[in-house]
C-alpha cells in the first residue's frame, strides 16, 4: 500500500513528502538546523507537517535560532537550580538582548559559589543530551501539574498573561503546553510550562555562561514578591561567546558611571535620591558645550526659544491625556492652595499639582496664548526643559535611565501641506547635528500604533504613519519596524546610532501628533479665513541631555574631542621657574574661552605627565627652558606623540582652529591634519 503524502513548500520550492514527516526528517542532513518556521511561526523540529504548509529552516546562528537556543538554555538553568534548591519556585525565563534570565523565589540570594555550582550542573545537563519534547495540556491539567508553583498558577489563570512580554514565553494565547526534558532512557527528568519552541536536545547549547544574579520584583511590580534573577548568555560557538565577553570587557572600560567618577564629572548623592544626577564643574562644562552648540544650530534653523515651569496643575495633564495613560510614570500629586477657616473647614478648595513628565502640554498653551495665522507656520518652539519621571528605584541606571532629565525638546506646529517637507528637513537637521557630535552610523526605527493604547482615529494614525514612513525611506537609511511601540498620541521615528564599539543607542525621536492639537483645541486661521487644526511634531534630538552625555562619554571612552572636553588644555611646567611663561600663554587661551588648567602640584614632572595622560585632556602643553627662551610651547597628545617648540602665536591659532572644527584629535598626526585643512 502506497504511503500517504502531503504537498509542502520548502524555501520556496514545492515538495511531496510522507504525511508523517516532521522537520527532523526534512532537514536530517543539516545539523545546523535546529527549528523550523511553519507558515511564518517558529516551531520545533518535531512538529508534524500538514498539507499546504510553507516551511523554512531556522539555523542555530540565525537571530531566531539564537533566541530559541537561549530559551532552551533558560530551561536547563532552571533545571540546575532546582537540583540545588528543590523547593525553588519558578517565575519566568525570557530571552533578552544577547542572553536571557530566569526568576526564582528562593530562601536567600544566590552567592557566587552557588552560581559556580549551578553552572557546573548546567554543563552536565548539556552533555547528557536531554531532548525537549512539547505536549499540550488543558488548563485543569496545567493547574494540577503546577500545584506547588504559585507563580506558574498565576500565569495560567491570568487570561491576559500572553500580553506581558516576559510571561509570553510561558503562555500562548492559543493553548497551554509543557516542555519535558527527556533523558536518553526516555525518562522525563524535568518540565516547565512553556509555549516554545525549543532545540531538539541540549547538545545544541554549544557555548553557555552564567553572568550574574540580582533581585527583581515578580512581573516588574514593587507590589509583588521579590525574586532572585539569574542572568546568562549563550552563543552558537565558543568563539562567538569569547567575542561577546571581549565586547563586555570593552564596554565595562567605557561604562559612563565608572568614567564619570574617575573624571570627576557627576555623581548621585544618596542625600538627593536615586536617578537624580549632580553634575560637577567638569561635567557641567561638557553639558554647557553641548547646549551652547545646540542653541546655536536651533537659532540658525529658526526655532523660537521658550521656557516653562517644572510644576503644573493636574488639569493640564487631564487635557493632554497623560494622567490617563501615563500616571504610573509620574510623581504623585501635591495638593496645594487649599484655604481653611479658624475651625479647620475648607473655605477654598485646592488643586493637585504635578511635577511635569513632559513639556508638550505647556508648549501647547504657548501656541494657544493668542490667535495664530497660517503665515506664522511652521512655528518651531524649543526648550531645554527639565522633566521628572517616576522610574522604579531598581530600574534607574546611571545617566541612561534617570528620574530627573533635561530634554532638548521641540514642538513644531505646521499645516498638513507643510508636514512632509517639515519632517524631511527636520530629519536632515537631526542627522547633521548628531554627526557634529561624532556619531555617523545610523538606522531608523518606525514605531506604530499599540492597538490597546492610543487616542485618535485609525484614519489619522494611518496618515501619520504613512507620512513618517515616506520621510524615513527617503533618507536612504535602513528602516526597522517597531509594531506597537508608539506613544498613545502618535507614531514616531527614532534615530538609532551605533557607537565606537558597535552598540546601538536610541538618540533622537521625531513624533507626529494629530491628537494633542485636538485635545487642546489648537487652531490657526487658514488662508481662506477658516479655523484649522495644526499638525504637531514632537522632537528631542539628544533624547535627554543626561542620556546623550552618557552615550558620548562611552562612545569616546572619556576622550572627548577638544570642543567638548571638560578641560581642553592642561599645562605642565617642567619646573617651577617655567610656570609664569606657561601661565601667560594659558591666560591668552582663557581669554578666548578655552577651558584650561595648570598643574602646580609638587609632584615630579614624570608623575604630572602620567596624571595628565589619565585625565584624557586633548592638549597637554609642556614648557621647559628651551620653550621659554624661544617663546614657544610643546604639545603632548593622548597617544604620547609630541610636537615640540611650537611658537605661542601659532600654537594658540592651531588650538582654536581644532576646537572650532569640532574634530577628534588624539595624536600629532591628527593635529597636523586638522590644522592643515
UniProtKB/Swiss-Prot annotation:
Which cofactors does the annotated protein need, by name?
A: Zn(2+)
Q: How is the cofactor bound?
A: Binds 1 zinc ion per subunit.
Q: Where is the TGS domain?
A: 1-59
Q: Where is this region: Catalytic?
A: 255-561
Q: Which GO terms describe its cellular component?
A: cytoplasm
Q: Does the keyword Aminoacyl-tRNA synthetase apply?
A: yes
Catalytic activities: tRNA(Thr) + L-threonine + ATP = L-threonyl-tRNA(Thr) + AMP + diphosphate + H(+)
Q: What is its EC number?
A: 6.1.1.3
Keywords assigned by UniProt, alphabetized: Aminoacyl-tRNA synthetase, ATP-binding, Cytoplasm, Ligase, Metal-binding, Nucleotide-binding, Protein biosynthesis, RNA-binding, tRNA-binding, Zinc
> Where does it localize?
Cytoplasm
Q: Biological process (GO) annotations?
A: threonyl-tRNA aminoacylation
Q: Does the keyword Mitochondrion apply?
A: no
Q: Which GO terms describe its molecular function?
A: ATP binding; metal ion binding; threonine-tRNA ligase activity; tRNA binding
Q: Which residues take part in binding Zn(2+)?
A: 360, 411, 538
Primary residence: cytoplasm
* Database matches in SUPFAM superfamilies: Class II aaRS ABD-related, Class II aaRS and biotin synthetases, ThrRS/AlaRS common domain
**How is the subunit organization of this protein annotated in UniProt?**
Homodimer.
Q: What does this protein do?
A: Catalyzes the attachment of threonine to tRNA(Thr) in a two-step reaction: L-threonine is first activated by ATP to form Thr-AMP and then transferred to the acceptor end of tRNA(Thr). Also edits incorrectly charged L-seryl-tRNA(Thr).
Per the record, the similarity remark reads:
Belongs to the class-II aminoacyl-tRNA synthetase family.
Against PANTHER family, the record matches this protein to: THREONINE--TRNA LIGASE, CHLOROPLASTIC_MITOCHONDRIAL 2, THREONINE-TRNA LIGASE
NCBIfam families tied to this protein: thrS
**Official protein name in the record:** Threonine--tRNA ligase
Amino acid at each position: 500500500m502506497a504511503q500517504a503524502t502531503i504537498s509542502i513548500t520548502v524555501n520556496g520550492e514545492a515538495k511531496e513528502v510522507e504525511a508523517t514527516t516532521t522537520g527532523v526528517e526534512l532537514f536530517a542532513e543539516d545539523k545546523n538546523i535546529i527549528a523550523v518556521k511553519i507558515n511564518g511561526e517558529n516551531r520545533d523540529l518535531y512538529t508534524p507537517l500538514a498539507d499546504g504548509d510553507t516551511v523554512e529552516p531556522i539555523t542555530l546562528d540565525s537571530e531566531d535560532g539564537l533566541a530559541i537556543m537561549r530559551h532552551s538554555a533558560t530551561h536547563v538553568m532552571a533545571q540546575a537550580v532546582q537540583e540545588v534548591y528543590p523547593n525553588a519556585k519558578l517565575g519566568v525565563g525570557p530571552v533578552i538582548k544577547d542572553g536571557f534570565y530566569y526568576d526564582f523565589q528562593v530562601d536567600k540570594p544566590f552567592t557566587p559559589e552557588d552560581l559556580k555550582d549551578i553552572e557546573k550542573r548546567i554543563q552536565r545537563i548539556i552533555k547528557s543530551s536531554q531532548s525537549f519534547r512539547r505536549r499540550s495540556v488543558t488548563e485543569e491539567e496545567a493547574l494540577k501539574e503546577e500545584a506547588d508553583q504559585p507563580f506558574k498558577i498565576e500565569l495560567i489563570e491570568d487570561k491576559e498573561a500572553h500580553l506581558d512580554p516576559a510571561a509570553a514565553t510561558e503562555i500562548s494565547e492559543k493553548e497551554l503546553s509543557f516542555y519535558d526534558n527527556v533523558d536518553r532512557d526516555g525518562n522525563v527528568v524535568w518540565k516547565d510550562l512553556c509555549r516554545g519552541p525549543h532545540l531538539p536536545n541540549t547538545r545544541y547549547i554549544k557555548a553557555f555562561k552564567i553572568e550574574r544574579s540580582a533581585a527583581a520584583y515578580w512581573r516588574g511590580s514593587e507590589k509583588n514578591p521579590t525574586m532572585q534573577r539569574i542572568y546568562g548568555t549563550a552563543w552558537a560557538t565558543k568563539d562567538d561567546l569569547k567575542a561577546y565577553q571581549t565586547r563586555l570587557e570593552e564596554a565595562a572600560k567605557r561604562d559612563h558611571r565608572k568614567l564619570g567618577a574617575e573624571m570627576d564629572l557627576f555623581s548621585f548623592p544618596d542625600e538627593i535620591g536615586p536617578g537624580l544626577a549632580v553634575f560637577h564643574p567638569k561635567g557641567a562644562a561638557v553639558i554647557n558645550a553641548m547646549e551652547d552648540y545646540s542653541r546655536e544650530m536651533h537659532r540658525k534653523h529658526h526655532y523660537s526659544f521658550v521656557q516653562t515651569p517644572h510644576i503644573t496643575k493636574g488639569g493640564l495633564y487631564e487635557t493632554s491625556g497623560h494622567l490617563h495613560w501615563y500616571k504610573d510614570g509620574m510623581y504623585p500629586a501635591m495638593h496645594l492652595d487649599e484655604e481653611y477657616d479658624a475651625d479647620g473647614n475648607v473655605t477654598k478648595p485646592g488643586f493637585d499639582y504635578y511635577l511635569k513628565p513632559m513639556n508638550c502640554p505647556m508648549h501647547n498653551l504657548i501656541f494657544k496664548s493668542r490667535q495664530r495665522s497660517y503665515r506664522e507656520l511652521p512655528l518651531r518652539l524649543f526648550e531645554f526643559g527639565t522633566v521628572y519621571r517616576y522610574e522604579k528605584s531598581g530600574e534607574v541606571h546611571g545617566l541612561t535611565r534617570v528620574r530627573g532629565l533635561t530634554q532638548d525638546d521641540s514642538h513644531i506646529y505646521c499645516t498638513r501641506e507643510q508636514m512632509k517637507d517639515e519632517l524631511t528637513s527636520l530629519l536632515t537637521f537631526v542627522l547633521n547635528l548628531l554627526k557634529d557630535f561624532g556619531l555617523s552610523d545610523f538606522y531608523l526605527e518606525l514605531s506604530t500604533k499599540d492597538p490597546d493604547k492610543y487616542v485618535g482615529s485609525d484614519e489619522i494614525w494611518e496618515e501619520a504613519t504613512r507620512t513618517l514612513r515616506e520621510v524615513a525611506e527617503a533618507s536612504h537609511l535602513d528602516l526597522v519596524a517597531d509594531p506597537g511601540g508608539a506613544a498613545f498620541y502618535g507614531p514616531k521615528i527614532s534615530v538609532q546610532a551605533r557607537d565606537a564599539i558597535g552598540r546601538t543607542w536610541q538618540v533622537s525621536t521625531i513624533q507626529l501628533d494629530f491628537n494633542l492639537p485636538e485635545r487642546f483645541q489648537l487652531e490657526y486661521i487658514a488662508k481662506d479665513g477658516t479655523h484649522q487644526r495644526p499638525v504637531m511634531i514632537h522632537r528631542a534630538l539628544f533624547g535627554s541631555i543626561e542620556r546623550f552625555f552618557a552615550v558620548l562619554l562611552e562612545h569616546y571612552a572619556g576622550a572627548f574631542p577638544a570642543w567638548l572636553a571638560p578641560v581642553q588644555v592642561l599645562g605642565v611646567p617642567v619646573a617651577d621657574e617655567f610656570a609664569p611663561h606657561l601661565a601667560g600663554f594659558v591666560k591668552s587661551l582663557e581669554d578666548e574661552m578655552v577651558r584650561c588648567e595648570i598643574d602646580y602640584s609638587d609632584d615630579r614632572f614624570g608623575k604630572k605627565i602620567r596624571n595628565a595622560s589619565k585625565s584624557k585632556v586633548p592638549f597637554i602643553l609642556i614648557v621647559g627652558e628651551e620653550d621659554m627662551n624661544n617663546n614657544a610651547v610643546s604639545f603632548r597628545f593622548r597617544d604620547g606623540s609630541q610636537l615640540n617648540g611650537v611658537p605661542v602665536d601659532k600654537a594658540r591659532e592651531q588650538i582654536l582652529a581644532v576646537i572650532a572644527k569640532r574634530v577628534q584629535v588624539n595624536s600629532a598626526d591628527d593635529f597636523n591634519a586638522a590644522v592643515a585643512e
